[in-house]
Amino acid sequence: MLIIILLLIASYLLGAIPFGLWIGKIFFKKNLHDYGSGNTGTTNTFRILGVKAGIAVFIFDLLKGTLATLLPLIFHINGVSPLIFGLLAVIGHTLSIFDHFKGGKAVATSAGVVLGFSPFFLLYLLVIFILVLWLFSMISLSSVVAAIFALLGILIFPSFGFILTSYDLLFSIIIFALAIIIIFRHKTNLKRIKNHCESLVPFGLNLSRQKEK
């Protein structure tokens, strides 16, 4: 029981590591909270610190979720779903004890959790993400739409045995929780999208005709 508690705490602490914030401060002498959206996640890192830093933060944030999800397997723990460990990593990422309980928007770390538990489901979401990104040129919208399609996937796919072969109540609950976290963390982005002033990536069709301020 003690090892389970320690690993649950470790999952939160692992997720709480603010790689974007630390990389910005150590290597670029910049506090991401003072630039762009003020967020310490992958997207703001790309915009403020550049491609190399953005890729590094994305990989680290993704692996936080994956490693936390795999902790029960690594330590041969039974009786507690790996998804619980993954969810704690996402909570750590969004409410980091190392960053005054601030954090990212949970997309990369949530993707890492899904990667550790159901890689093909993540692949399905990645296709949705890339398609929406190309059509609308917005990472925020792509993230929210992928979260919505994750909810649709857990409802529909088990009926056809496609990707998800059967209904898994806990997986459905965790996916629901992750989707809600992602959508909630993007509420300011959704307001900007509504006002046609959301930040864009430098490619894609920008079908909604956003104009960055």
Swiss-Prot record:
Record pathway: Lipid metabolism; phospholipid metabolism
Query: Which NCBIfam families does this entry report, sorted A to Z?
Result: glycerol-3-phosphate 1-O-acyltransferase PlsY (TIGR00023)
Transmembrane spans: 3-23, 48-68, 71-91, 119-139, 144-164, 165-185
Q: Where in the cell is it found?
A: Cell membrane
For this protein, the record's InterPro entries field holds: G3P_acylTferase_PlsY (IPR003811)
**Record's GO cellular component, any one?**
plasma membrane
Main localization category: membrane
> What's its catalytic activity?
an acyl phosphate + sn-glycerol 3-phosphate = a 1-acyl-sn-glycero-3-phosphate + phosphate
Biological processes per GO annotation: phospholipid biosynthetic process
Q: Which family does it belong to?
A: Belongs to the PlsY family.
Q: Which domain of life is it from?
A: Bacteria
Tell me the function of this protein. Catalyzes the transfer of an acyl group from acyl-phosphate (acyl-PO(4)) to glycerol-3-phosphate (G3P) to form lysophosphatidic acid (LPA). This enzyme utilizes acyl-phosphate as fatty acyl donor, but not acyl-CoA or acyl-ACP.
Q: What is this protein called?
A: Glycerol-3-phosphate acyltransferase
Gene name, please?
A: plsY
Q: Name one GO molecular function term.
A: acyl-phosphate glycerol-3-phosphate acyltransferase activity
What SMART domains does the annotation carry? Answer: G3P_acyltransf
Tell me the membrane topology, using the record's own terms. Multi-pass membrane protein
Record-linked HAMAP family? PlsY
